[in-house]
Amino acid sequence: MNEDSRLSSSQQPSTSTPRSSIPSTMNSDEPNTCRRLSQSQEQPSTSRTCKSETPEFGYSDSLPFAPWRRKRYGLNIQGLHEEIVDMYHWIKPNEIESRLRTKVFEKVRDSVLRRWKQKTIKISMFGSLRTNLFLPTSDIDVLVECDDWVGTPGDWLAETARGLEADNIAESVMVYGGAFVPIVKMVDRDTRLSIDISFNTVQGVRAASYIAKVKEEFPLIEPLVLLLKQFLHYRNLNQTFTGGLSSYGLVLLLVNFFQLYALNMRSRTIYDRGVNLGHLLLRFLELYSLEFNFEEMGISPGQCCYIPKSASGARYGHKQAQPGNLALEDPLLTANDVGRSTYNFSSIANAFGQAFQILLVAVTLRERKGKNHVAMRAYKGSLLHLIMPFTSKELTYRNWLMSGVLSMPGQEAPASYDLNQLHNTLVSPMVDLSRYAWLRKAPAKAEKRDSRPLTIVNPADDRQTLAQQLKKQILEQTEAKKSLEKMPACDDNKKEEELVATRETDVELEAEDTESEGHHNGENDLILTGPPLPTSTQSVNTSATVSTAASISEREDTDSPGLSSSMGNQSSEEDEDNGINNRNNSAVPVQFKKPFNEVVAQPARESKRTQTTSEDKMQDQFHFNGYSYPPPSRYAAGTAAPSHKHRNAHPQRQRPSIRNLSQGSDGSDEYNVESWNNNIRQGRRASSNSPSPSRQQTNTRNCGPTNNIPYDSFRSQNKNSTLDGSNNSSEEPITMYADVVKKKSSITTSTNTSTADVNVTNGNPIPANGIIPQSMAVVNVGRGSYRNALTTSPMTPPSAHTSMQKQHHLRKDNECGFDNNSATSSTDLSHHQPQLVPPVNRLQR
């Protein structure tokens, strides 16, 4: 049924009938056909009759039957409430739909203003768009107000319709001049939305303001209005020109319901405790389908009461309402009957009754006796789907409308970007593409053939140019220097000034280069510094001894390089091991260590202070009969009363069979004969592994072996030293290896003690009176150490040297590979030079 047929039949009360219910061809039996036609006209449009419609081409039922469903709702009143809440959140207008309709309204407003530019008119929107209670398929209501209209209302409508067609913004335009409220109905070309344009109907704007106040007083009206509007729209009972109920009339019915039957729900929201929208919906359907007598009674929402139709007609001076019509008084204007066009309210009441029965049976199905397996199997998880399903056409249209709308201008019309909008998701804000219209416009110089693309600058090129500039400056400086050299001698002062200036510029350029390099490294996040290099275990004591005990005068006498305290620099031994790395890292290799024989052979002032390994110790010893013994040391008195702080702070590690010669640690008690390590040379007691308490006490034993040197001569050599190793004089005691080497050069063959006075048992000289002083006495004779064994056991002949080497419990003092046979015949240290032994003999030992 088209719009013309609907307008022609608007004078007679009739129900809106689906197209499929009317047969297209008449059978031979005309009475039966007329009877079926009359029955179909009397019956209201229900969900069953609407489902029988054949779907249009291009649409199918593949979309979900209840798109708002989030779960399987229970068959009870609480499940109905939860489903209504979910449907409200799904169907309510979002920001995209609101702004889209606002854009369409602005387009229509501009067109009407251009058409009536000679008159002062006012254009505004009202209805569901202003109250934000519109459905995805709702139309847009536009009001045109003007005080100096000339002619009949039909002329205004026709002129407005011609202007809309001329602007090419309407797909179709229809004029309804014979209606109670004359309107121009058009369909937008871009969005397919319907627009109703009315003239001088101020009541619509007032009604929109009234609905906004009602929503503030009864917030629960909003979800029920949207649900019932979709319910009526599904049955084609929402258009007034076909006898349906308008949106304003539906709001007044809900206001009357809340005022009389649910007044306690004022200012309550859907999430408040005690609110159940399912109960309110069932009560509303029951009231207006079974209890309200619309044929004899009218409704007055302003007075909160029911009024008989006869009284209403006589009271306001109007004729009585029609028996089948709805009498609904406007609270803003009591003389206005909002339901005067709702002549098909009987069909609306029947639809309310059917929905009430369906929902009532569904929510009470589990409470009934017996098992309704058929009903349970038919239930798909949604109750509202039984009374108001959404068609695939409506869902497809809504998704298309929110996905994106682009206006394509005609051939003659200029390019306009007023309606260009982009929507990505349902919650994304509106994006007006008019702000990006300049991207589509070609630049003025784009058509020229000699246009060149933009140059891409590489940062590397900038660095190259900077390097070239620096080279030019350097060349200029060199030329300036050459010119200064050619100047006469009389201008020496000027020449010096210019040289100073050039030097200053060189320094500035170097500073700039370093800053640029640092800036470049900072940009690339490159860290050029690293952690300190590890120090090998063989140079720990050596570096520590040299760095802590050496004085400034000693460092000046030696030719060793400067040492670093905490920067992690490599020691002399590591430099020798990593000679290849040193050659690669530095342009000019620096030799940090010399061979041992060169150090001993060279003068004392040129000796290396850092050479303090086991080789130094072997040099300080003298050899007798194949065994190495400590020389008559001048440090015995200094080590007579050592301190145990070093031992307590750094306990000795247990190493049963391996001795680290560079660190001076003893492996066992049998190795105590060689306790002259670097700690002794610093005036401290050497560490030991013996658990004996006598070894932990002070002033009970000597740190070194017993030396039978006359006490007087010993006092004469160390007259400035005290027993604790301190020096009372201003001159510091000599504790470094370099000084020991110096002393070696001054030793002569004429000594205080001769070889005849040497004790054959321990190799120490015997005093003249035959009395050994207490400081030189042997301690712990009963201990099984190698030193005590030498003092107590008889002298071993040279022939037994080979057998003594097989005793593994004795100390191997020849681990460095020196030939001791050359030292057995003489004890003169001044002419003693160590000789290296081949590796084969070294392995055998």
Swiss-Prot record:
Enzyme class: transferase
Gene: gld-4
Positions with biased composition (Basic and acidic residues): 482-506, 605-620
Keywords: ATP-binding, Cytoplasm, Developmental protein, Magnesium, Manganese, Meiosis, Metal-binding, mRNA processing, Nucleotide-binding, Transferase
Assembly and oligomerization: Interacts with gls-1 isoform C.
Compositionally skewed regions (Basic residues) per UniProt: 643-653
Record note on domains: In contrast to other poly(A) RNA polymerases, lacks any RNA-binding domain.
Protein location: Cytoplasm; Cytoplasmic granule; Cytoplasm, Perinuclear region
Function according to Swiss-Prot or TrEMBL: Cytoplasmic poly(A) RNA polymerase that adds successive AMP monomers to the 3'-end of specific RNAs, forming a poly(A) tail. The enzymatic activity is enhanced by its interaction with gls-1. Required, together with gld-2, for early meiotic progression in male and female germ cells and for gld-1 protein accumulation in the hermaphrodite germline. In the germline, forms a complex with gls-1 which directly binds to gld-1 mRNA and prevents its degradation.
Biased composition (Polar residues): 26-49, 561-571, 579-588, 654-666, 695-732, 788-805, 819-828
Keyword Nucleotide-binding assigned: yes
Protein name: Poly(A) RNA polymerase gld-4
Region described as Disordered: 1-55, 482-733, 788-845
Comp. bias (Low complexity): 7-25, 535-551
GO CC annotations, alphabetized: cytoplasm; nucleolus; P granule; perinuclear region of cytoplasm; TRAMP complex
GO molecular function: ATP binding; metal ion binding; poly(A) RNA polymerase activity
Cofactor: Mg(2+); Mn(2+)
Note: The gld-4 locus produces a single transcript that is SL-1 trans-spliced.
Statement: the UniProt record of this protein carries the keyword Aminoacyl-tRNA synthetase: no
Domain PAP-associated: 276-335
Residues engaged in binding Mg(2+): 139, 141
InterPro entries in the cross-refs: MTPAP-like_central, NT_sf, PAP_assoc, Trf4-like
Organism: Caenorhabditis elegans
GO biological process: cytosolic mRNA polyadenylation; meiotic cell cycle; mRNA processing; polyadenylation-dependent ncRNA catabolic process; positive regulation of meiotic cell cycle; RNA 3'-end processing
UniProt-listed Enzyme Commission number(s): 2.7.7.19
